[in-house]
Curated annotation (Swiss-Prot):
The lineage of its organism: Bacteria, Pseudomonadati, Pseudomonadota, Betaproteobacteria, Burkholderiales. Its EC number is 3.5.2.7. Its cofactor is Zn(2+); Fe(3+). Its main location: cytoplasm. GO terms for cellular component: cytoplasm. This is Imidazolonepropionase. It comes from Burkholderia pseudomallei (strain K96243). Fe(3+) binds at residues 68, 70, 238, 313. One of its GO terms (biological process) is L-histidine catabolic process to glutamate and formate. Catalyzes the hydrolytic cleavage of the carbon-nitrogen bond in imidazolone-5-propanoate to yield N-formimidoyl-L-glutamate. It is the third step in the universal histidine degradation pathway. 4-imidazolone-5-propanoate binds at residues 77, 140, 173, 241, 318. Belongs to the metallo-dependent hydrolases superfamily. HutI family. It catalyses: 4-imidazolone-5-propanoate + H2O = N-formimidoyl-L-glutamate. One of its GO terms (molecular function) is imidazolonepropionase activity.
């Protein structure tokens, strides 16, 4: 590609709507990295005569980052939605053989090609909203062959689509039916066979565990973290979603990239996360969809300076959501985040939750030129509108990969 000077734009380079430039320009090198950003009046002489692209006064933000998804799976769980409307809880449905395990059955039965095609349909609307990086977890196979198939599909999505895909091995997502009553033995399988094999195949960027009374204990979760550490892999945790089990403090002890959900997080967990630099990933779509009533401790997170990220948590059972903009709206309306917190939560802080701050979440010299173009008057509109397509253009590595006539 050729070097380009993008101009006539309003720039929010670091995901903070309180830190912007009204008349800005972005110089992008031929290799797709950013050469310079700043005021249009300050363009260095070396870039002034580069070919230009006029963005007609639109806002530019870093490409959005969806840092927690379960995008690859078989089937759907609309029947459970009806059960919840009739009064059944998430835990009750799981105890009846529904929940995660029902998706495990559908995923095990699906071919790799079928999983790929279904995942493509879920990914496309996210890309059209300006998402340029996404995390995709396994965890609906719960045995080696199916977990491998899920992670292979995630890698294929990154090859087919203009999006950076970060894979997370979530073998410790639920107890498979064949291991009923033998959770410790299943953790043996996860740590001694599944993780080593998948890591050796280059399919794993990070390791996650569902630490909850319907998931795995602290001791079992720690075994998974130890196995990840032996492989030099970063960890993250589904923690404190349904109860306060101390998972966030354990995650912090292992310097986890993130602890996610966190409705029942307490002050000790918040302090531990602050000390370890662990990002709090909040998932308002799941909170809304399962009609949770316990809010995450937003004020505690703010007071301790814990970075807050937002993600869709796309999954078939508790958050069949394919809109990061709607997630921003929910973060503001349900969790009472500010627009500033919401936008940082899907850019800079979301990148930190993936351990990818050097590549995503901010527009600075040397980083990938991944950005989204928004023909709006104020960045608050990104969280204000819902159900309305706002993104006019997506640029990935300096190349336009999506356009919509939004004016």
């Amino acid at each position: 590609m050729k070097s380009i000077l993008w101009h006539n734009l309003k720039l929010c380079a670091h995901g903070d709507p309180n830190d912007t430039i009204a008349d800005a320009a972005i110089a992008v090198n031929g290799d797709g990295t950013i050469a310079w950003t700043g005021r249009a009046s300050d363009v260095p002489a070396g870039y002034v005569h580069w070919p230009r692209e006029d963005l007609r006064g639109a806002w530019v933000t870093p490409g959005l980052v969806d840092c927690h998804t379960h995008l690859v799976y078989g089937g759907q769980r609309a029947d459970e939605f009806a059960q919840r409307l009739a009064g059944a809880s998430y835990e009750e449905i799981a105890q009846r053989g529904g929940g995660i395990v029902s998706t495990v059955r559908a995923t095990r039965d699906a071919s790799e090609a079928a999983l790929f095609e279904q995942a493509c349909a879920r990914l496309r609307p996210l890309l059209a909203e300006g998402v340029t990086a996404i995390e995709i977890k396994s965890g609906y196979g719960l045995e080696l062959a199916s977990e491998r198939r899920m992670l292979r599909v995630a890698r294929q999505l990154g090859e087919r689509f203009p999006v950076s895909v970060y894979t997370t091995f979530l073998g410790a997502h639920a107890l498979p039916p064949e291991y009923a009553g033998r959770a410790d033995e299943y953790i043996d399988e996860v740590c001694e066979r599944m993780l080593p094999a998948l890591a050796d195949e280059g399919l794993v960027d990070a390791v996650d565990v569902f630490c909850e009374r319907i998931g795995f204990t602290l001791a079992q979760s720690e075994r998974v973290f130890e196995a990840a550490a032996r492989r030099g892999l970063p960890v993250k945790m589904h923690a404190e979603q349904l109860s306060n089990g101390g998972g966030s403090a354990l995650a912090a002890r292992y310097r986890a990239l993130s602890a996610d959900h966190l409705e029942y997080l307490d002050a000790a967990g918040v302090a531990a996360m602050r000390a370890s630099g662990t990002t709090a990933v909040l998932l308002p779509g799941a909170y809304y969809f399962i009609r949770e009533t316990k809010l995450p401790p937003i004020d505690l997170l703010r007071r301790h300076g814990v970075p807050i990220a937002l993600a869709t948590d796309h999954n078939p059972g508790t958050s069949p959501l394919t809109s990061l903009l709607l997630t921003m709206n929910m973060g503001c309306t349900v969790f009472k985040l500010t627009v500033q917190e919401a936008l940082l939560g899907v850019t800079r802080h979301a990148a930190a939750a993936l351990g990818a701050s050097d590549r995503h979440g901010s527009l600075a010299p040397g980083r990938q030129a991944d950005f989204a173009v928004w023909p709006v008057s104020t960045l608050a509109e990104l969280a204000y509108w819902f159900g309305r397509p706002l993104c006019e253009r997506v640029v990935k590595g300096g190349v336009t990969v999506f356009t919509r006539d939004a004016r």
